[in-house]
């Protein structure tokens, strides 16, 4: 039912069935920022319903404004590919080395091209990107081939890519299932789809519920678990070969990113120590709040 306290009017919103199984039997879990998060009674997929009629247009505007706010784009791009970030991206790109380096690797939601730089540095000859935020897309296209439209609307040759990467993407999309179908059609046989997304079956969610930092109705409109993302990948012909999780934020409501007093600094330090201890545990389970999945095209 429409929430009269929402900042959006009813004409801005649209009711949708479950993107995984197609049923229309949602159970309301909680509300956040005027949006209802529901769980499908049939398959357990969690999603926002009703949601904005044009969620992708909303995302494009938001992330383009965010990119434009950075000002010096060269400086921002350097920040996105330096120090620990660079090491992490190089390590990730190296994981795909068993695939054909002379082939093609696609990063959907490539931003300022940090991962594309890592892939090129590891020897990939044809790193490519997709980015819907014009400011970021125009910047990265100076260095790599970048298309500025939704993946499903792009006409690639079938079986074009060896690896397709989706980092913090599918939770924003109107239909993650449609994107997975397009990814399957654009991967070579044995090609790899790599997805990173928030994990709704995490210890962070258990402790924080709707206060969890990744919940915000107009932005993250799908929330997956290891179970539901595996089901959706399987429904689109993929075989899941690995699932991992990491990370935890236990007190997002009170965590101060820029402390202004000794007490706040002390509180932050204690929180970070607790989170590091718990992260050691959740990395060995599937309870981390960051979910990463590797799936192969059969």
Regions found by a protein language model. Name each.
Residues 1-167, 177-180, 245-246, 257-261, ...:
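Conserved N-terminal segment of class I S-adenosyl-L-methionine
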Residues 166, 174-182, 192-298:
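S-adenosyl-L-methionine-dependent methyltransferase catalytic module, highlighting the catalytic core
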């Amino acid at each position: 039912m429409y929430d009269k306290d929402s900042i959006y009017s009813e004409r801005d919103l649209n009711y949708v069935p479950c993107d995984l199984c197609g049923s229309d039997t949602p159970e309301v879990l909680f509300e956040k920022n005027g949006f209802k998060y529901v769980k499908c009674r049939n398959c357990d997929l969690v999603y926002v319903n009703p949601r904005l009629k044009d969620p992708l247009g909303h995302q494009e505007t938001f992330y383009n404004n965010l990119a434009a706010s950075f000002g010096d784009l060269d400086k921002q791009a350097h920040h996105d590919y330096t120090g620990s970030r660079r090491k992490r991206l190089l390590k990730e790109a190296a994981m795909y080395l068993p695939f054909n380096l002379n082939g093609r690797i696609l990063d959907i939601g490539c931003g300022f091209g940090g991962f594309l730089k890592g892939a090129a540095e590891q020897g990939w000859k044809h790193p490519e990107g997709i980015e819907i935020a014009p400011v970021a897309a125009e910047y990265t296209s100076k260095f790599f081939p970048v298309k500025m439209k939704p993946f499903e609307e792009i006409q690639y040759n079938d079986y074009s890519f060896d690896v397709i990467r989706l980092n913090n993407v599918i939770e924003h999309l109107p239909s993650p299932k449609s994107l997975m179908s397009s990814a399957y059609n654009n991967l070579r046989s044995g090609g790899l789809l790599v997805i990173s997304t928030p994990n709704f079956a995490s210890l962070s969610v258990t402790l924080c519920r709707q206060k969890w930092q990744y919940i915000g109705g107009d932005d993250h409109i799908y929330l997956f678990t290891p179970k539901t993302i595996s089901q959706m990948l399987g429904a689109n012909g993929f075989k899941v070969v690995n699932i991992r999780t990491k990370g935890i934020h236990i007190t997002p409501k009170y965590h101060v990113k820029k402390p202004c007093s000794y007490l706040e600094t002390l509180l932050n330090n204690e929180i970070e120590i607790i989170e590091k201890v718990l992260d050691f545990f959740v990395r060995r389970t599937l309870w981390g709040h960051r979910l990463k999945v590797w799936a192969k095209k059969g």
